[in-house]
């Protein structure tokens, strides 16, 4: 009976925490407290493949828009691993439109030097110079990309982190340009949101974005634009993955 009672208390606490957070649109510190540029600033989200923006960065994109930042997106490949590049470009534009990013602020590199291939190591210096060009062209105040583990461990994701890290450590970023990296978490935290929630809220945070239920529906709608990628396991991903509703990020 004691075990049952403890389980009931645990479930009640988790449910309370879930409901407390779920429909709050302000689950992060002020931009100034977090070290972020304020309203009117320009953010550049740097991804490797079409669908990264919906699978991983939707909470950040919607959260930055909520903070009145102008969000642009730089995608390094067309996702042509299965010769679907042209289809995936169109899907990316549709997804970005759902997330509030117009086509004029979506840049797709799609060069042979940056193939969608986990077996190919992108050249860090080349990636870095390309990112820097777009930072200058867009007068960027904030760069957002993957962390050292790339969330899923994909080498193309990690290549982006290495490039941005090189720019940051080398002092090549424009003055006042900040960098946020998306925190990778273990499989249990990634797919069991109720268990992850208390850990996320109690852990030291750089920046935390938690979507409202309405925004989660928006993120799922963006993901549904990637029809060529919606295999059965990705449907499960949209239901269970924390990255459809929560992003925790760290400043470099």
From Swiss-Prot:
Gene: Pigl
Phylogenetic classification of the source organism: Eukaryota, Metazoa, Chordata, Craniata, Vertebrata
Record's comment describing the protein's domains: Retained in the ER by two retention signals, one located in cytoplasmic domain, and a second signal in transmembrane domain that is functional in the presence of membrane proximal residues of the cytoplasmic tail.
Family, per entry: Belongs to the PIGL family.
Pathway: Glycolipid biosynthesis; glycosylphosphatidylinositol-anchor biosynthesis
InterPro entries in the cross-refs: GlcNAc_PI_deacetylase-related, LmbE-like_dom_sf
Protein task: Catalyzes the second step of glycosylphosphatidylinositol (GPI) biosynthesis, which is the de-N-acetylation of N-acetylglucosaminyl-phosphatidylinositol.
Protein's name according to its UniProt entry: N-acetylglucosaminyl-phosphatidylinositol de-N-acetylase
UniProt membrane topology term: Single-pass type I membrane protein
Record keyword Lipid metabolism present: yes
GO biological process assignments: GPI anchor biosynthetic process
GO cellular component: endoplasmic reticulum; endoplasmic reticulum membrane
EC number from the UniProt entry: 3.5.1.89
Transmembrane segments: 2-22
Pfam families reported for this sequence: PIG-L
Protein localization: Endoplasmic reticulum membrane
Record carries keyword Endoplasmic reticulum: yes
GO MF annotation list: N-acetylglucosaminylphosphatidylinositol deacetylase activity
Catalytic activity: a 6-(N-acetyl-alpha-D-glucosaminyl)-1-(1,2-diacyl-sn-glycero-3-phospho)-1D-myo-inositol + H2O = a 6-(alpha-D-glucosaminyl)-1-(1,2-diacyl-sn-glycero-3-phospho)-1D-myo-inositol + acetate
